[in-house]
């Protein structure tokens, strides 16, 4: 009632949100849904079904007539998210080269890394362009570290990124964190 009594649903999109936020929204009596999409998917590709119990860390399931699959899946079950459906773009205007870089057999290669559970719910875990590759070849996504740091009560904001010591391909990649307390 403090919000006017008519607000039934809040939809979040753009980036994974802390599960505590979704739970809080539902605790005050408002259904919390998450969506996933990009400009190239006009704009939604996945959404939490309203009738499903919330899975706060998930961006939902593929919307009607849309197929979402993973490419180059690693041992953790994560891979690049590919999207195909009637709302996926035909291509970038007058830029066939850029179009060919992101389209594969009718699927749009999002650049987002995620996993899909056995029920079809999608979980975004990072961006392929953000990946930090350690000396032993392990892939680390800054977003995962940010989520862990965000659970520390004394940290109000943080940002994690990778930076090479120099342009030499053999140099180490450093993991840097900016933390606001």
Predicted region positions:
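Gly/Ser/Thr-rich phosphate-binding loop
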Residues: 1-54
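Short polar/acidic secondary-structure junctions
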Residues: 37-38, 50, 73-75, 165-167
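Conserved beta-loop-beta connector loops within the AMP-binding
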Residues: 67-84, 102, 115-119, 167-170
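Conserved ANL (AMP-binding/adenylate-forming) active-site segment centered on the GW(Y/F)…HTG consensus within
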Residues: 53, 88-111, 146
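Short coil-to-beta-strand transition motifs
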Residues: 60-65, 108
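Thr-Gly-centered strand-to-loop micro-motif
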Residues: 12-13, 34, 70-71, 83-84, ...
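AMP-binding/adenylate-forming catalytic core of the ANL superfamily
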Residues: 85, 90-91, 113-179
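Conserved ATP/PPi-binding loop(s) of AMP-dependent carboxylate-activating enzymes
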Residues: 62-63, 74-101, 138-140
């Amino acid at each position: 009632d403090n919000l006017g009594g008519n607000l039934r649903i809040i939809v979040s999109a753009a980036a994974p949100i802390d599960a505590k936020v979704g739970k809080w929204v539902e605790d005050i009596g408002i259904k919390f849904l998450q969506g996933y999409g990009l400009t190239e998917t006009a704009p939604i590709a996945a959404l939490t079904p309203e009738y499903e119990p919330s899975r706060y860390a998930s961006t939902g399931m593929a919307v009607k007539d849309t197929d979402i699959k993973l490419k180059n899946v690693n041992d953790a079950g994560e891979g690049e998210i590919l999207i195909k459906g009637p709302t996926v773009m035909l291509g970038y205007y007058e830029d066939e080269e850029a179009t060919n870089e992101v389209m594969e057999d009718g699927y749009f290669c999002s650049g987002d890394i995620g996993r899909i559970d056995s029920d079809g719910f999608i979980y975004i875990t990072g961006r392929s362009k953000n990946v930090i590759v350690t000396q032993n070849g392990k892939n680390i996504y800054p977003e995962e570290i940010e989520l862990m740091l965000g659970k520390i009560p004394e940290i109000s904001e943080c940002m994690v990124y990778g930076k090479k010591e120099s342009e030499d391909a053999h140099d180490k990649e450093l993991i840097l964190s900016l933390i606001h307390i």
